[in-house]
């Protein structure tokens, strides 16, 4: 299995067009700060659009580290979607040797040439999910006509969390997976989303008991 690790490292280092994971954290945080300031303004804070924009900026920061990542993605494709890993370790998951590719914001686990899961190391914005849900619910509260736009952002959160839940389950991080599915369900509990998908809650409970 050492050969697998060395092969993956060689592929990453030989890709001249590939770069380290690039996320413009400063720009994302500046956008959030701008929208937070607007939401605190008495006049602007009374408008649904202000809160929708705030929610969008949180969602953008949430999705940035893993936006092009998915379970089953070819490992060789990671250099294009995420850039070069900082390092590659050999780890054992469920008795199998797996390549753990370490990036600034996420560690991606590759087995048999495919991504089997990942674990986020550092968020772009701490607490962004809870803040996004609150901002989007506020937007809907102020103007229910914004419902479709609010739902789009909330479903982006739910889908992100569900994918994270699957990814964590595959690498034995059951507690993190359970929390991710619970958050996915919570995002869908907004009136803008209608009836939440009960399977999110089922998987949250299933992984909590694993």
Q: What label would you give each PLM region?
A:
Residues 53, 163, 197, 203-206:
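Canonical tetratricopeptide repeat
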Residues 1-28:
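Bacterial Sec-dependent N-terminal signal peptides
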Residues 29-57:
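N-terminal targeting signals for Sec/Tat export/insertion, comprising classic cleavable signal peptides
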Residues 45, 57-175, 188-198:
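Short coil/linker segments at helix-helix boundaries
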Residues 21-31, 47, 74:
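N-terminal, post-signal peptide beta-strand-biased segments of exported outer-membrane/organellar beta-barrel
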Residues 37-40, 141, 186:
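Conserved structural position within tetratricopeptide repeats
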Residues 22, 50, 57, 167, ...:
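Residue-level signature for tetratricopeptide repeat
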């Amino acid at each position: 299995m050492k050969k697998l690790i060395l092969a993956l490292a060689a592929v990453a280092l030989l890709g001249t067009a590939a770069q380290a994971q690039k996320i413009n954290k400063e720009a994302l945080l500046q956008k959030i700060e701008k929208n937070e300031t607007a939401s605190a303004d008495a006049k602007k804070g009374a408008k649904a659009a202000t809160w929708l924009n705030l929610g969008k900026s949180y969602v953008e920061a949430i999705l940035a580290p893993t936006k092009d990542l998915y379970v089953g993605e070819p490992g060789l494709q990671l250099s294009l979607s995420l850039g070069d890993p900082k390092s590659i370790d050999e780890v054992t998951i469920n008795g199998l040797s797996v390549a753990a590719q370490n990036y600034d914001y996420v560690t991606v686990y590759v087995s048999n040439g495919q991504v089997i899961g990942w674990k986020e190391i550092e968020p772009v914005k701490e607490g962004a999910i809870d803040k996004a849900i609150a901002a989007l619910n506020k937007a809907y509260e102020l103007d229910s006509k914004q419902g479709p736009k609010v739902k789009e952002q909330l479903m982006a959160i739910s889908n992100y969390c569900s994918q994270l839940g699957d990814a964590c389950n595959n690498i034995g991080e059951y507690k993190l997976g359970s929390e991710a599915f619970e958050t996915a369900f919570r995002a869908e509990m907004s009136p803008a989303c209608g009836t939440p998908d009960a399977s999110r809650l089922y998987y949250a409970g299933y992984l909590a008991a694993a």
